Amino acid sequence: MLKDYLGISGTREDELRNSVMEVNQSQTIDGLTVTVRQAFGDAHTVYVLAEVRVPEGLPFEGKIDEVLVNTKLRDDGAVYNWLLVNKDEATKTQTYIIQLQTLKSILKKTIRIRFIDFRNVADYQNRNYFRGEFDFSFRISYKNIAVTKGLNFRTDKYTVKSVTLSPVTAIISFDAGTTDKDYDIDCRIITKDGSTPHVAWVNYIPEINPAIYINFDDVIDPDNVIGIVINGVEYLFTD
């Protein structure tokens, strides 16, 4: 399920599969059913798989209007996004992926996800065909298989403290006060086998604990990563 959408594969495939957390919480309002199936990730990034079953009377070409994600972490610098990734006409089921990133560890913490309204995107008036809120809360309890590499590399603009690698992200931490909010960051990772995992996007968060979050299209094997490249400069791990 979730592993299929994230592209889990590689030398640690079994370990990655086993770190998927089952949630299986479901709510139904007026025939519309939302189910939170699974969660997967590390201490700072969570992927959540949710399904929406659309009843007769609602347009299947519609979708959930809004997804809101909250944590109980203070000053966590959390960012999130969500995407409709699949529609099964035969079962009238839509699949959504929600991604949450936090500066503070989310392990053993509770996250809250709310699915709000259902609208027909094919309707030029963009009307809501269902109004209601599905409210879910669950504690993150999957196995954390991230590894951290110390670097302490200095440049004229910043000091790279460490890189934390997980199957879904690479988090590059800086010394506080050494980063520029407007600094343009271009990052990628270096692998043992020469492969170049495609970077989906890069989030640069200079506040609180300055860090770069590199998000990959597919799940990576942290053991296959031997270094990083920041703005054309290579940093190889020594351990």
Question: What residue spans do the PLM features occupy?
Answer:
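Alpha-helical, hydrophobic structural elements that either
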Residues: 1-239
